[in-house]
Amino acid sequence: MGRIIRVTGPLVVADGMKGSKMYEVVRVGEMGLIGEIIRLEGDKAVIQVYEETAGIRPGEPVEGTGSSLSVELGPGLLTSMYDGIQRPLEKLRELSGDFIARGLTAPALPRDKKWHFTPTVKVGDKVTGGDILGVVPETSIIEHKILVPPWVEGEIVEIAEEGDYTVEEVIAKVKKPDGSIEELKMYHKWPVRVKRPYKNKLPPEVPLITGQRTIDTFFSIAKGGTAAIPGPFGSGKTVTQHQLAKWSDAQVVVYIGCGERGNEMTDVLEEFPKLKDPKTGKPLMERTVLIANTSNMPVAAREASIYTGITIAEYFRDQGYDVALMADSTSRWAEALREISGRLEEMPGEEGYPAYLASKIAEFYERAGRVVTLGSEPRVGSVSVIGAVSPPGGDFSEPVVQNTLRVVKVFWALDADLARRRHFPAINWLRSYSLYLDSIQDWWHKNVDPEWRKMRDTAMALLQKEAELQEIVRIVGPDALPDREKAILIVTRMLREDYLQQDAFDEVDTYCPPKKQVTMMRVILNFYERTMEAVDRGVPVDEIAKLPVREKIGRMKFEPDIEKIRALIDETNEQFEELFKKYGA
């Protein structure tokens, strides 16, 4: 038990704290606010408090809990909404109304709810960390696998029969090699700053299909990959994150609203229960865990929310699921680090951020990956991390963006100019990149189309050529261009408007499956080949621009039937043949 000697914003200094350890959770003051020790000097402890510290004064008690900041992992995580330190917001609302009272806690997993447990092991079986004890149908989409905690191994001496149990009831007893008995419940705790162990990492060879054409075709992310979405205000970071949370083919989505506006989390809460998962037809909320740590919540908890989210994601990965984690936005987390570092009077680095910013960001993104899990029957699971970065004024040379780019393999650069032109998703195809293309192209070739990479590279080359031509057009006007280059501008406009642009609010266009993406690309590239042939055969470019099929190509993104889109290839060819006849080419 210690006493407060100093309070500065979210930081509290207490003395008489001998015997405490780093990152231990403490209760601060008469109100019992939750805090975490982040520095120890002699018997003094520096504590970052995860709640508003107004009204606390020197002399009040500080009590250690003996455990580090941990999350509860078990049935009940899905469909829940937590704050940054895994307090269930719905439960807190029942306890204190719309405004959360300070010092309030509630168990993260519901203690009174009974779950239907079906054992998969029997007495006498040998188990190690990561083995599955049994399964619980948590939602209609996800079957929750009850895992042996990583530190336990031994022989099952008792296992619960199939039936309904709460998370607090003992469902198994394991005799460890030293003869002691470990009681296992449906949940276990895990410290958030420690990454969960696995057997080994696998190369990222399977793409995370998002249903967004720009991303899947040009700048793919692999399952277990890392991506950053930097962009200025209003360029569509949050809507892009929402689209990925809705439609990506991950089985579980963890969405962290870290220091962003509260209304954006409200949007997710309003929309997700109504939206249907394209694969199962069930509400999307049934595969989602939300962590809300909005801009009006205490700054210190932003740091915790990032770690809480990634630990929950790793837990579902250990069950053999593909998990997508959205962090919106990591800039606010970095700003929280900057504020706490300033209060600790540490030497500032670039733009006032702490010198350890780069290693903190790397540590977070390194917890992504596709892995073989622990256990006697290894499974494959993955955590893909997609972090939004909001640099002030859209300046990509800012430290958070630069340090993030060193670590992540995919960069989706959002562009304010594109957003102003109402071109969404506003991902700038000239500045963005993906380093996963070589490793995932085999999957595309095997499962979708053997010419995927060739078509993607052709389209990319056309878009780059367009950027060069646009500069010439700005100086001398479009009429000075030769016919071939005028024709390229017609095709690239189709690529931009009919392929890259996508309507997140249209029922059909919000999600574009891989087969449809490839068919659409084939239609446009076929038009390009025929256009070049027509120009070489002397057909005027103006005539090509007037072809009626162009309007149909413009509407194909709203057409759910792939065969109807494929039919546009024949229609294009017929209309070009008529042009050739007309001009005797």
UniProtKB/Swiss-Prot annotation:
CDD domains: ATP-synt_V_A-type_alpha_C (cd18111), ATP-synt_V_A-type_alpha_N (cd18119), V_A-ATPase_A (cd01134). Transmembrane segments: none annotated. SUPFAM superfamilies: C-terminal domain of alpha and beta subunits of F1 ATP synthase, N-terminal domain of alpha and beta subunits of F1 ATP synthase, P-loop containing nucleoside triphosphate hydrolases. It comes from the Archaea. GO terms for molecular function: ATP binding; ATP hydrolysis activity; proton-transporting ATP synthase activity, rotational mechanism; proton-transporting ATPase activity, rotational mechanism. InterPro entries: AAA+_ATPase, ATP-synt_VA_C, ATP-synth_a_Xtn, ATP_synth_asu-like_sf, ATP_synth_asu_arc, ATPase_a/bsu_AS, ATPase_F1/V1/A1_a/bsu_N, ATPase_F1/V1/A1_a/bsu_N_sf. Belongs to the ATPase alpha/beta chains family. Has multiple subunits with at least A(3), B(3), C, D, E, F, H, I and proteolipid K(x). Component of the A-type ATP synthase that produces ATP from ADP in the presence of a proton gradient across the membrane. The A chain is the catalytic subunit. HAMAP family: ATP_synth_A_arch. NCBIfam families: ATP_syn_A_arch, PRK04192.1. This is A-type ATP synthase subunit A. The lineage of its organism: Archaea, Thermoproteota, Thermoprotei, Desulfurococcales, Desulfurococcaceae. The gene is atpA.
